[in-house]
């Protein structure tokens, strides 16, 4: 609790000092949420409550970088740069946008025993501008390498700007830097992998990667996914199951560290199917169990009241 007060009357004002949590580094550009709650009791003894949240930070501007998780070298990576107030209102800003190739570790680091999932996944939820602790198993912590692209940017009244950058297969980090109206630096970052789906070799030194352009497909199309390992050699066991029946089961190819998994989707597969991946290396099991949605888009329910 930051402050509290009592009042009498039909209007009131609350003033408090929005002090930061000093255990959170200012370098991470944190945003703090302060919630004001009021309990009002009328003359009959009935109490009503309401609350309002206020956001405060070291800067008056927030910036983000967005891009789809699935990227291939066949087409440019499309980035969306956004600058907003801490309350999410669009704000115009200008600055620089750069893309760096990352310095990969000399060898693949196996996953920690405490983790129950592959040690790196897109959209892990880490704050975009947070600098994680050095960890060769976590690409978000890898050091920056050579600059691949650098350019100025300017968001307009909408607070957004779209850019496209052609990139070869590999792993990169996009970095944005701008300033708020008080001249304080605001940053954002996004780690991105670009894949070459025609290659037999997975180019990033992580133990296990499983990705797909879409996890919802329609009958008449083909589901596509990619499995890869950064080890010099490695094979995974792949199973595709539908309604407790195995559609296909196979080992990824010998002599390759990247495999494209494809499955033709039929009408009979509506409701979805499951892709299971089993890969074991250096006493670590990397297991995937992903449901691919095949929606009942051919069925429509209409409800009417008369």
For each predicted feature, which ranges?
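A structural signal for beta-strand and strand-to-loop patches characteristic of beta-rich domains
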Residues: 1-306
């Amino acid at each position: 609790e930051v402050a509290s007060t009592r009042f009498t009357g039909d209007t009131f004002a609350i003033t408090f000092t929005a002090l930061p949590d000093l255990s959170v580094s200012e370098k991470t550009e944190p945003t703090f949420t302060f919630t004001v709650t009021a309990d009002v009791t009328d003359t009959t003894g009935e109490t009503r409550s309401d609350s309002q949240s206020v956001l405060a930070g070291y800067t008056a501007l927030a910036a983000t970088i967005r891009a789809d998780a699935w990227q291939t070298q066949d087409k440019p990576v499309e980035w969306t740069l956004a600058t907003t107030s801490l309350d999410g209102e669009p704000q115009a800003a200008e600055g620089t946008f750069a893309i760096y190739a990352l310095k990969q570790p000399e060898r693949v680091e196996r996953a920690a025993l405490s983790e129950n999932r592959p040690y790196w996944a897109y959209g892990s939820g880490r704050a975009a501008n947070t600098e994680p602790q050095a960890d060769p198993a976590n690409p978000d912590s890898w050091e920056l390498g050579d600059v691949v692209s650098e350019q100025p940017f300017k968001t307009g009244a909408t607070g957004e700007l779209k850019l496209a950058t052609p990139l070869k297969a590999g792993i990169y980090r996009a970095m944005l830097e701008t300033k708020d109206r008080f001249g304080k630096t605001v940053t954002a970052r996004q780690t991105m992998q670009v894949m070459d789906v025609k290659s037999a070799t997975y180019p990033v030194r992580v133990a296990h990667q499983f990705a797909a352009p879409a996890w919802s497909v329609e009958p008449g199309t083909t589901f596509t996914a990619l499995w890869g390992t950064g080890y010099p050699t490695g094979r995974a066991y792949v199973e595709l199951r539908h309604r407790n029946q195995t559609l296909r089961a196979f080992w990824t190819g010998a002599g390759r560290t990247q495999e494209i998994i494809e499955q033709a989707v039929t009408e009979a597969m509506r409701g979805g199917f499951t892709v299971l991946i089993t890969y074991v290396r250096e006493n670590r099991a990397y297991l995937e169990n992903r449901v691919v949605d095949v929606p009942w888009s051919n069925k429509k329910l209409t409800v009417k009241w008369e």
